[in-house]
Amino acid sequence: MSTSVKQTEARAIAKYIRMSPFKVRRVLKQIRGRSYKEALMILEFMPYAACKPVLQLLQSAAANAQNNYGLQKDQMIVNYAYADPGPVLKRFRPRAQGRGFKIKKPTCHITVSLKEVL
């Protein structure tokens, strides 16, 4: 007896994005719970640099939903979206009198999930 359950959720993950998770979360808060089309509009017109990788990731999640599970893009909403901190690249900036200041270049892992609304 095999019962097939239709998958109604698709996600995409972007790892090691060279951006602070704090700045990415500011963008993700705006699209969480919105429809796919509304989220696209918001991301295209927001003035933040974090919008570009989030927009690409949202489109990737929608393509995953369409190709892997046969879901329709018009009926999708952003189920969850979050940014976790990744490894921090540490660099030194030479300063006066032989000193060196530490520069931290943060990275993050972004996850976006789309869910079909019936």
UniProtKB/Swiss-Prot annotation:
Keyword Calcium: no
A Gene Ontology biological process term: translation
CDD domains, per the entry: Ribosomal_L22 (cd00336)
Superkingdom per UniProt: Eukaryota
PROSITE patterns per record: RIBOSOMAL_L22
Keyword Zinc: no
Cellular component, GO, one term: chloroplast
Example GO molecular function: structural constituent of ribosome
Protein keywords: Chloroplast, Plastid, Ribonucleoprotein, Ribosomal protein, RNA-binding, rRNA-binding
Subcellular location: Plastid, Chloroplast
UniProt cross-references to InterPro entries, sorted A to Z: Ribosomal_uL22, Ribosomal_uL22_bac/chlpt-type, Ribosomal_uL22_bac/org-type, Ribosomal_uL22_CS, Ribosomal_uL22_sf
Family annotation (SUPFAM superfamilies): Ribosomal protein L22 (SSF54843)
Function: This protein binds specifically to 23S rRNA.
Similarity-based family: Belongs to the universal ribosomal protein uL22 family.
HAMAP family tied to this protein: Ribosomal_uL22_B
Assembly and binders: Part of the 50S ribosomal subunit.
Protein name stated in the entry: Large ribosomal subunit protein uL22c
The organism of origin for this protein: Rhodomonas salina
Phylogenetic placement of the source organism: Eukaryota, Cryptophyceae, Pyrenomonadales, Pyrenomonadaceae, Rhodomonas
